[in-house]
Amino acid sequence: MPQPFLFEGVARGVRVALALVPFAFAACGPSPHWYKGNLHTHSYWSDGNQFPEVILERYKDRGYDFVALSDHNVLADSERWVTVSDIPNGTTSLGEYSSAFGPDWVEQRQDDSGRTQVRLKRFEEYASSVADPGKFLVLQSEEITDHFESRPLHVNATNIAELIPPQGGASVADVLQHDLDAVNEQRRATDQPMFPHVNHPNYGWAVTAEDLMDLHGDRFLEVYNGHPLVRNEGDSLHPSVDRIWDIVLTHRLTHGLGVVYGMAVDDAHHYEQMDSTRANPARGWVMVRAKELTTDAIIDAMEAGDFYASTGVVLDDIQSSSKRLALRIHGEDGVTYVTQFIGTRAGFDTAEQALPDVEGLPVTHRYSADIGTVLAEVPGLDPTYAFAGDEIYVRARVRSSKPVANPVHAGEVQLAWVQPVVRRAN
């Protein structure tokens, strides 16, 4: 475990200085567009229950512009046959696969026991079968599935070039750092744009804010994951991932470690039965404002923070300047919207309390309510926050009154998370 941190000096504004906002808007060149994508998805290459091509076609039909299949500790770059009777939903999935893609595409054979086997297509094959330049993009990815003792630690690598095995380590933070380093080293070695992100910190109560706050080379965190086991909202003893994000942001920005952006993903595994017990598609996604639908443009925009995360709320525009952060929400009839502008001000209370382990697992420390406080709450479709000048960062969370179509928990409504605008950084 990392040592608990102290906000020495910086809490009084002594070591903070005005910083640029994380995203800016081009004054020339092609007009940017919003592109919808999911960067955490599973198929028969690991523990998903559908063929890659069928999964991608479904996202395409739902209006997604880009998708990454991120199977556990594997890339789709080798010959692999699956036995239909051994895979979940095998017979039904094979029928749909054959109907959609035809017998010339679906390769089948019988094993020595007469059981039907199907060859899983490699990435180059399945991506080319559904990709449509300028309209639908497929990225090669991996969920690096690691652990420390009993704690599951997962890092996604988006647009990866070569398989990265779990790197291991001597603590939670050490494992995560090694896995992040491996992705970033591959990027340097191959000169291929790619990035890592830390997955579902509350899954298995594996990752605390203290584990995340001093990591290097990680600019993204799943603030929402649609799997029913990941505990986005926390509980009475564990903070929500939203709260973890604010704790991490405050520490990093007051210690010169840089911003972390929030992502939403669905972490889909189950594509047939849609209910709250299944990890279904289309529960969470990112909307990226990029000049074109290419891998480079999507990654550039995300690394600049020019995207938002959503479970259903649509934003037409996000604008920030030296004076304000302004949103334009795409409203629906009969739906109300309230936007919370959230941040931490210089001079915040640095009080911190370590908490006892719960069932042998560390728990995120307790911090002042000054961290990630609600700076303003604005109803309507055009919420704006005028900077007071002492904010370290400001982010926005939009809450609608419209229920999500396939909730994990009763009462879930559609949300959107706007990336933090960094006002003051060490």
Annotate each PLM feature:
Residues 31-199, 204-208, 229-233, 237-243, ...:
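A metal-dependent hydrolase metal-coordination microenvironment
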Residues 57-61, 210-217, 280:
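Short, surface-exposed basic-aromatic patches at helix termini and helix-loop junctions that form
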Residues 28-29, 33, 46, 52-56, ...:
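C-terminal functional module detector
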Residues 13-26:
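Bacterial N-terminal signal peptides
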Residues 1-12:
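N-terminal secretory signal peptides that target proteins for export/translocation
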Residues 223-224, 248, 265:
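Catalytic-domain carbohydrate-binding cleft regions of carbohydrate-active enzymes
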Residues 210-230, 287-296:
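Structural recognition of alpha->loop->beta junctions
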